[in-house]
């Protein structure tokens, strides 16, 4: 459904469809090259459609990957927080050094930053996906 919406809203596809209409309007079987112009415009339209599908699929996969990454970073943050609790107890009992304790604190801070970064990546990917549904896609097809 979202892909259909993206194809419907794509300027690139509209542009190539317009070129096909224009080529058909200029078509005259008695004039050399007009049949080739129609065929060329149709081929360009097919390539544009494939390019939009590929770009939309890539955008969708990016959102999925970012969701997975965010979940993994949250799990890593939870583990770092548990490790810090353990390190706190060990430090208070004199089992580990202050450096080891501070490294556990740093690991928690790093994990929190990684979660924030993953969240921002997901947010960006989702916004790109929403724009893709509106037909704003980065494609490799020539304009």
PLM segments and residue spans:
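Acidic, low-complexity, intrinsically disordered peripheral segments
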Residues: 117-143
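Amphipathic, heptad-repeat alpha-helical/coiled-coil signature enriched at exported N-termini
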Residues: 3-48, 70, 77-80, 101-105, ...
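Secondary-structure edge/capping motif, primarily at the C-terminal ends of alpha-helices
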Residues: 26-31, 52, 88-91, 136
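Alpha-helical heptad-repeat coiled-coil segments that mediate oligomerization/polymerization in large
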Residues: 52, 59, 94-98
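C-terminal structural cap/anchor segments
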Residues: 54-55, 69
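Short, charge-rich amphipathic alpha-helices with coiled-coil/heptad character
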Residues: 42-53, 141-143
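Charged, solvent-exposed structural "stalk/scaffold" segments
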Residues: 68-115, 130-131
């Amino acid at each position: 459904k979202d892909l259909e919406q993206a194809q419907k809203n794509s300027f690139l596809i509209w542009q190539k469809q317009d070129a096909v209409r224009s080529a058909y309007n200029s078509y005259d079987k008695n004039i050399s090259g007009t049949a080739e112009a129609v065929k060329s415009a149709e081929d360009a339209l097919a390539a544009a459609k494939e390019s939009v599908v590929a770009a939309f699929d890539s955008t969708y996969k990016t959102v999925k990957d970012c969701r997975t990454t965010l979940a993994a970073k949250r799990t890593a943050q939870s583990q770092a927080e548990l490790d810090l609790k353990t390190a706190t107890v060990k430090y208070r009992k004199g089992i580990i050094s202050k450096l080891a304790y501070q490294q556990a604190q740093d690991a928690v801070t790093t994990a929190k930053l990684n979660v924030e970064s993953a969240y921002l990546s997901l947010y960006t990917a989702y916004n790109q996906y929403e724009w893709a549904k509106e037909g704003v896609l980065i494609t490799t097809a020539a304009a």
